[in-house]
Structure formats: C-alpha cells, structure tokens
C-alpha cells in the first residue's frame, strides 16, 4: 500500500475505501510515521519496565482526550472494551451491561459475542448479563433500568456510527443527520443523565470515532463526558495499539497504588506498551494537528458522498447503491432488487 492505494501482484493500483478497516488515517507507508516506529524498534521496542515512550504517549493521550485522567494501552479493541466492563462491574458491584442492538461489535469475548448470532463456541452464561436497547431511543434504555433496578453496571455504546445521536424531536434523516451534534439534549446526553441517575457507568467506545470525528474524540464533538472510553483503529495509522481511558476513581481499580486492596486482573498484554506502536501514535497525532487532517476528513468526505451519489443517480442505480453516514467516515450501501442489503453486490 502507498498513500490511499493498494496494489495487487500484477502491480495494478486500487483506491482503497476501507484503509485497513479504518485504522489507517494518514495513508499507507507514511514515511514520518514509519521512521518514528523504526526509531523505537532500534531502541528496544518492548522493555520489561515502562518506557519513556509509554510515558509520553500516556501524557499525550490524557492531554487530548478530555475524560481520560488515566490510560492503559493494549494491542486491540476487544482487550480494552472487556477491561472497561471489568472495571464497571468492580466499581459498581453489579453484573449487567447494556449495549445498543444496532451497533454490531464491541468485543470478541463471550460477554458480548455470545449475545449475537455468531456465538458458536461461547458460554451461554457469559452473555446472560448482556442486555440490548435501541440506539436513539431513550425509552428502550429506561425500560431496562426499570426491569433491572440497581443491577446495570454500565451502558456501553459508540457515540455515533451511521446513526447520529439525535434529539427526540430531530426532523433529519437519522442516517444522515449531522445537525444535532452540539445540542445539549441529544441522545448521548440523555444516556449520560440516565446513567448518573441510576449509579451506572457510561462507557463510550470510540474505536471508529476516535481520531476521526475530532482529535479530542467524538466526546468533544458531542460535549459528553463518559466515565470510561476506549480507542484504537486510527490511533497510530495502522500500527496495533488500543487504549482504555477514564476517570481516575474508576481506573485506579486496575492499578497497584493501594497495597492490600483487592485487585482486578485488568489486561494481559505483553506487547501492549510496544514502543514502535506508541511512537507511531505520537507521530500520528503530531501530523493530525499539523496538517489539519480531521478538517480534511469532513470536507473531502462531504465532496465524496455528494459526488458518488450523483454518479449513482446519473447511472440510474441510486436505489441500489448510495453513500451515507458522517462525512468524516462515509459508508456505501448496496441493495438488491428487493431492497434488501446485498453483500454480494457490495463485493463488486
């Protein structure tokens, strides 16, 4: 890969829509980021004790992510989302976790994946404590709190995907609305109020939105302060790193600051503080700031959506192919003659 293109064995170039499953946000083979990673490799890459690079990365993370007073690094998203669930259960003394039905993935661990249709090989009892509600429907979440009083440890959700966190009286199309972002009573604020009222933690999963919606996270765009938050994907332009951040009061339960206190085995991640990935993270943030990358996502994405939808309309296939979602992270939809989503059409 180079820039926005990937090449096959015949050296044919393809413009890459997915960009490393959205983990590559600056471009393939970026020399500055590669050099930053290489410099850490020749300095040892993975040390027994915490490195200065890890310290710098941690200081940078808590500086740019408003809700993060502490941070723990890992290698992939499932590690940190499951760690967040452990913290929530330990902090509240409760068992149940609520997640939106519409958001398809939070972890490959049994607590979540066992609650989906792809559950072969999981333990049923592990997912018995995972509850589902409807995104943008606060009443469906209120219903869970009534059914499970004082039993829900956390509500975990992505701040936005294709769907936007709208206000109750939003008149926009739910899959295209970008207008409710800064309104104080959008869905995320309703969730935050409800979790506080019930002594439940709010966990924002920013795997997709992080370092794409806003340098300081979608939590900044929507002016929301979660108890815990998780990041990954575009943190380091394709290098493997993820992060769990949050309030010190909660995060410290996974630390060793209080001798004799009962501890959480928060993560097992030998390579979690690998210096090459953390060096890439530091350089990626530097480039995002320097080159106004986030602004470019929004501006170029808007043009891309409009242009592709116009082409589809000109070809008279706009009922079967169209682009929707946020301008900084557009998604293309393919449908068959019956109007059903078609994955085989998507491969074309």
Per-range role (PLM):
Residues 1-348:
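Conserved N-terminal phosphate-binding loop of PLP-dependent enzymes in the Aspartate aminotransferase
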């Amino acid at each position: 890969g180079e820039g926005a293109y990937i090449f096959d064995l015949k050296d044919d170039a393809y413009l890459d829509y997915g960009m490393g499953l959205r983990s590559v946000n600056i471009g393939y083979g970026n020399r500055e980021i590669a050099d930053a990673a290489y410099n850490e490799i020749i300095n040892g890459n993975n040390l027994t004790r915490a490195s200065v690079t890890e310290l710098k990365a941690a200081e940078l993370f808590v500086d740019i992510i408003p809700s993060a007073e502490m941070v723990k690094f890992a290698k992939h998203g499932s590690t940190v989302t499951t760690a967040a669930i452990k913290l929530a259960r330990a902090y509240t003394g409760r068992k149940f976790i609520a997640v939106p039905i519409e958001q398809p993935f939070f972890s490959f661990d049994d607590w979540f994946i066992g609650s989906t249709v792809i559950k072969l090989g999981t333990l049923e009892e592990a997912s018995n404590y995972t509850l589902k509600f409807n995104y943008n429907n606060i009443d469906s979440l209120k219903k869970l709190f009534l059914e499970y009083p004082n039993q829900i440890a956390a509500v975990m959700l992505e701040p936005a995907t294709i769907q936007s966190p709208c206000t109750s009286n939003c008149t926009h199309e739910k899959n295209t609305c970008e207008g409710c972002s800064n309104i104080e009573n959008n869905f995320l604020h309703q969730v935050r109020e409800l979790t506080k009222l019930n002594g439940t933690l709010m966990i924002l999963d920013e795997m997709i939105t992080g370092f794409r919606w806003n340098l300081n996270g979608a939590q900044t765009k929507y002016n929301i302060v979660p108890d815990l938050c998780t990041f990954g994907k575009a943190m380091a332009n394709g290098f493997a790193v993820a992060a769990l951040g949050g309030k010190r009061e909660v995060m410290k339960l996974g630390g060793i600051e209080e001798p004799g206190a009962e501890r959480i085995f928060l993560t097992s991640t030998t390579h979690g503080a690998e210096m090459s990935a953390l060096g890439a993270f530091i350089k990626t943030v530097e480039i995002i700031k320097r080159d106004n990358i986030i602004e470019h996502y929004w501006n170029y994405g808007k043009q891309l959506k409009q242009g592709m939808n116009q082409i589809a309309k000109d070809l008279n296939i706009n009922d079967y192919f169209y682009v929707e979602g946020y301008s900084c992270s557009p998604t293309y939809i393919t449908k068959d003659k019956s109007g059903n989503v078609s994955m085989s059409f998507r491969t074309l």
